[in-house]
């Protein structure tokens, strides 16, 4: 791995194999990638192409080694290529890759999720977080027979049309599309409100409570950086939904099994009506799920009129990886993640203060963000004050020192059980140098 005290080489000279692969990719993939954040557009330069991963390490196409804080954007809570998960998937593959028919494995998976999440009576497996949130909203609309939904600025729930929406100019105005290709007629059914703003939420329900099918949110936001809920905010969401006949949806694709075995709802002691899960529950494979109250989930086909299907839903390899991962989420793992997270938080904060940087560090469990703004960051409006140019320079300097930090100011970093105390020390040392550069 690059020594944290060595002078960083020029970026173009550091990864010629990645550069060659990116040039090839640009000819056949839009932007050279299969998901926009991977292109490094937010931080400049070309992305690294990863050849393999092990534990808390990534190895790029040029053979360089990095301490990884992206963790495949959250799933790798045990670290990469955990031997037990790899062996379970290898054994399952010998029995067939996909059947398009029910299996005992998917029943065991559903039973395990229900054990971890008391709010979930029944669930349906899908293949991505976008599918999970899209389906949960369809279920909420079908159950309530209403169309409007509330989301919060800075909360990302996948790329379904009705979720790629930003707020209009007024409190309860119609939404406007945040992406080309999203019809305004669809966007108008989505109300976007400031996160952590109880007054705005109460006013929206007062104005349009009878139209609202659901409120969906990340209970701890990770897609504008790590932003925790203000005390009482999550409970208010649930209470207002119940009062007005709407459904509360916790999007725990990121926080599920990350903040606790039972996710944010275990950590905060709350039970939403519907929950979406992904990332960790798939053990690094394409697996997600949505579920909740039995009376709500009974509207899902073939029991009810809300249609949702998928060729690879409940895929045996993905479910096997998920079960192997879930079985290894022990109290000791979360204690270790908390200790490592606290050490990293303290070190990053001290490094920022020592450099005189206008920055703040926010962490919940093993999710953490160094914001280049004074903070605290409670909403998208706060996050948007971050100095993204300073972050880009920081990211490049960290990468040059062997630290693979998320390539966006607005993405949380993740710790895993494979990180060591030495990894944390190296990362803090690299951060001190990066901030002084």
Curated annotation (Swiss-Prot):
Pathway: Porphyrin-containing compound metabolism; protoporphyrin-IX biosynthesis; 5-aminolevulinate from L-glutamyl-tRNA(Glu): step 2/2
Presence of the UniProt keyword DNA repair in the record: no
EC number: 5.4.3.8
Keyword vocabulary terms for this entry: Cytoplasm, Isomerase, Porphyrin biosynthesis, Pyridoxal phosphate
Subcellular location: Cytoplasm
GO cellular component: cytoplasm
Residue list for modification N6-(pyridoxal phosphate)lysine: 279
Gene3D superfamilies noted in UniProt: Aspartate Aminotransferase, domain 1 (3.90.1150.10), Type I PLP-dependent aspartate aminotransferase-like (Major domain) (3.40.640.10)
Catalytic reaction equation(s): (S)-4-amino-5-oxopentanoate = 5-aminolevulinate
Any one GO MF annotation of this record: transaminase activity
Listed Pfam families: Aminotran_3
One biological process term in Gene Ontology: protoporphyrinogen IX biosynthetic process
Cofactors that this protein relies on: pyridoxal 5'-phosphate
Signal peptide: none
Family per similarity comment: Belongs to the class-III pyridoxal-phosphate-dependent aminotransferase family. HemL subfamily.
HAMAP family cross-referenced by the UniProt entry: HemL_aminotrans_3 (MF_00375)
Quaternary state and interactors: Homodimer.
Name of the molecule in the record: Glutamate-1-semialdehyde 2,1-aminomutase
Organism: Sorangium cellulosum (strain So ce56) (Polyangium cellulosum (strain So ce56))
